Amino acid sequence: MVREMFVGIDVAKAQLEVALRPGGVRFTVENSAADIAALVERLSGHEPSLIVLEATGGLEQPLSIALAEQGLPVVVVNARQVRDFAKALGKLAKTDRLDAQLLAEFAERIRPQVRDLSDARARALEALVTRRRQVVEIMVTERNRLHATYDAAVRGDIEAHLLYLQGRKDSLEQELMVLVQANPDWLSKAQLLRSVPGVGPVLTVTLLAELPELGCLSHKQVAALVGVAPLNRDSGLLRGQRGTWGGRATVRTTLYMAALVARRSNPVIAAFYERLLAQGKAKKVALVACMRKLLVILNAMLRSHTPWQHPLVPTPAT
């Protein structure tokens, strides 16, 4: 029987810490193009079942792309996912640093879904989605500064910057649309997604770029992947209600905004939301449930290649 091997790699600016599991082999290499190429070749010889890297603000991209282009199964995970996993095992204090051995254990026990990182077009789409999000975050910060500033010169400077940022945001959104329209598969999926009331262009491109598995997984799997599936967090003396945690935070945030719109404009989501409130659910709990329901609907539509059909929904009881 062939024994599976799992690899964790802790990426820093100067070096890469690598851990193999089982076996406990650990070694460190420089974070350079030459050493990355040598590491990829070395790992290829082990035929690992899964390689896990922590997202480190882009530092991980050269390595993750090189591994993917070699055909190796690599996953870039959010640090919070691994930290929650480690705390559940009692292996990590709040301020402890994640290491390669922990990432390897996470790979072996959790086995996160592998994403195709080798497609240059997909990387370009994700990069543009990320950049648009960054511009929006800067705009929010600048608007907050504007509200707190009374000096005329400073206000004028902030307003000019906001005008520039709005132009950049518009340009990025146009570039995203061009990319989607140039790819028949993305365009087909986008048309299906946009047929759903409450699903706009931002959620559409976010799902295409950051949740390419949509339509290929079960409802439970896709909900867990995004982080809207209710999960038990009981451990030792820690007992409580089920909650949602982990998953792809950027997708979840965008889905939250879409659910806010859908609870007013989508008859299915609106009726579902009112029914949960009538059952005594808190508004936040009901909204998270709406996020999950909307995601499940979108997953089913892409899997069956079926556009949205407006159902006859009875008016919720008041």
Tell me the role of every PLM-derived stretch:
Residues 1-167, 263-264, 285:
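Phosphate- and other anionic-substrate recognition elements at nucleic-acid/protein interfaces
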Residues 8, 124-127, 161, 189-195, ...:
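Residue-level recognition of specific faces of alpha-helices
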Residues 103, 135, 255, 280, ...:
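A residue-level signal for conserved active-site and pocket-lining positions in enzyme catalytic cores
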Residues 106, 125-126, 207, 254-259, ...:
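Short alpha-helical scaffolding segments that buttress acidic/His motifs in well-ordered protein cores
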Residues 146-202, 211, 266:
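Helix-hairpin-helix/helix-loop-helix acidic hairpins
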Residues 201, 206-279, 283, 310, ...:
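Phosphate-backbone recognition surface of nucleic-acid-processing proteins
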Residues 278-309:
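Charged substrate- and nucleic-acid-binding regions of tRNA-handling and nucleotidyl-transfer enzymes
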